[in-house]
Amino acid sequence: AVELTQTPASVEAAVGGTVTIKCQASQBIYSYLSWYQQKPGQPPKLLIYKASTLASGVSSRFKGSGSGTEFTLTISDLZCADAATYYCQTYSYSSTYFGGGTEVVVKG
């Protein structure tokens, strides 16, 4: 099994600011890391896959980086609509693993 540890658990920033979320894997997962955004009552939305590739239709304000065991999601020029919980995700041997989530609170 792969354990994904996200930090921080919660972060607050103002509109126009920048937020950085880290995800640490318990073993080398190369670049097999995705980031999802989830809002209450909605399914998760894929933002980034293969660590740094932006999913179709996703704003370039979202940037993923890292490889191996250390990964980062950066959200710049924050908007109120970015308020959500963000999860990192990977897979191994047909199993899917998620981080514990990071709640992003946007002050506007």
From Swiss-Prot:
Question: What's in the misc comment field?
Answer: Residues 109-139 of the constant region are identical with the corresponding residues of rabbit 4135 kappa chain. This chain was obtained from antibody to type III pneumococci and was isolated from the serum of a single rabbit.
Which residues does the annotated region (Framework-3) include?
57-88
An example of a Gene Ontology cellular component annotation for this protein is: immunoglobulin complex
Q: Which SUPFAM superfamilies match?
A: Immunoglobulin (SSF48726)
- For whether the record's keyword set contains Membrane, the answer is no
**Residue ranges, annotated region (Complementarity-determining-2):** 50-56
Q: Where is this region: Framework-2?
A: 35-49
Pfam families noted in UniProt: V-set
Region annotation (Framework-4) maps to: 98-107
Q: Where do the segments described as Framework-1 lie?
A: 1-23
Record flagged with keyword Transmembrane helix: no
Enumerate the UniProt keywords alphabetically.
Answer: Adaptive immunity, Immunity, Immunoglobulin
The record's region (Complementarity-determining-1) falls at: 24-34
For the region Complementarity-determining-3, give the residue spans. Answer: 89-97
Xref: Gene3D superfamilies: Immunoglobulins
| Designated name of the protein | Ig kappa chain V region K-25
Biological processes annotated in GO: adaptive immune response
